[in-house]
């Protein structure tokens, strides 16, 4: 603000009056200073003077509060005008013998605007759209010296004189990505430098702009189309081309169940991954929603997920353990809408139940009965399986395959007698010679003469018992030489006899043919002559 005008010194004022009014003549009234610029509510001293020496009347006419100062002379007076709120034109007047006259001083009041306000910006502004900035200014004078400036940061966007009350200045800006986070403001400039004062500035509160880019394409949602009760599934929602991506909000929900995703951000993309658990209360068709909110816009993708309950099929045996020859019923039951097969045989008619009847045999022991159920859910085939095993109790068995009846081993050789009984439960097996000497079944032994003989093998279980005789022959070394010699001699004699027979036979055939040729009797083809 400019300081108040200084009070003129009395000697200087007198000199001035003497210079202005050097002698008598027509009466003239003067005012000093003729022009004043002062802050609103300020005070100013105004001097009124006249050219006559003895005026009948000298004063000032003004609506402003005034006070005559003591200093003064016959033809001049000094007044203090206070609380100047607006432009004013106080008028000095004088009444002299030779006439009346007046003079005005022009008071110009300056003050900065009472309100400089930038209209609120949208909370979010899409990139590529026009943004209108609007600034309103109330008050401020003199208006001829008042300018309104719109700014982005420190960059001027528009400058206009303040016109009207309130003054309003607008401009349009095409929003860009790099405008995100920029501050916009409005500033007034009251320039009184030409009047010897200064530049007065008032700036509005800044408004920060938030820009965004949200593509028109909906987010991509990947999830299972069907989900079984009491299981978990994974849902992934993603979208590319967002700005600023960290400001994007992602909402994932299955029906009324809000999911809690883990969000991973890229440069301009995100991926939200969440686990979803379903219970029997959720069974049926549910809506899966992925919504992305950025700025004042949103994009949404919907999918349907079918929640189903499908327990594994139930395989029922009359008894899991039966004796040989017992009638057994095997049943397979599943979900009412499922189709079942039992050991590959489908139900007739096709449905959720199938059964099989059989008479238990030893071959059925350990047999698995597999029930497969298939349920169609939302166009997908769901498969479940269940297997049960049948145990058949049957008596002991000893046969040639598992327990050979005759063994012939060389003396002093290492041998392992093998005899295994079958049955369920597994029978106890003992092989004894003369009721006391055991055969070391399954053990590696050195064959001696004591091992030779006939053993009675007895297999016993809760299902009965069975016996089988087993003979062990032990060959001593001398018997082996005799046997080898006899066998070799037999081979030699047999070979010699066969050679003699073949030689004599060929000789007789040639002799017969010669006799027939001498008699002139042709030989009959394909007829073999009988030897003499």
UniProtKB/Swiss-Prot annotation:
InterPro entries xref list: ICAM, ICAM1_3_5_D2, ICAM_N, ICAM_VCAM, ICAM_VCAM_N, Ig-like_dom, Ig-like_dom_sf, Ig-like_fold
Secretion signal, residue range per the UniProt entry: 1-27
SUPFAM superfamilies: Immunoglobulin
Localisation per UniProt entry: Membrane
Pfam families recorded: ICAM1_3_5_D2, ICAM_N
Protein name: Intercellular adhesion molecule 1
Modified residues (Phosphothreonine): 521, 530
Residue ranges annotated for the Ig-like C2-type domain, each copy included: 41-103, 128-193, 230-297, 325-378, 412-464
One GO cellular component term noted in the UniProt record for this chain: plasma membrane
GO biological process, one term: cell adhesion
Gene Ontology molecular function: integrin binding
Motif position, Cell attachment site: 152-154
The keyword Disulfide bond belongs to this UniProt entry's keyword annotation: yes
Species in which this protein is naturally found: Pan troglodytes (Chimpanzee)
UniProt keywords, alphabetically: Cell adhesion, Disulfide bond, Glycoprotein, Immunoglobulin domain, Membrane, Phosphoprotein, Repeat, Signal, Transmembrane, Transmembrane helix, Ubl conjugation
Topological domain ranges for the Extracellular compartment: 28-480
Membrane topology according to the record: Single-pass type I membrane protein
Chain positions carrying an annotated carbohydrate: 145, 183, 202, 267, 296, 385, 406
Transmembrane segments: 481-503
Protein family per UniProt: Belongs to the immunoglobulin superfamily. ICAM family.
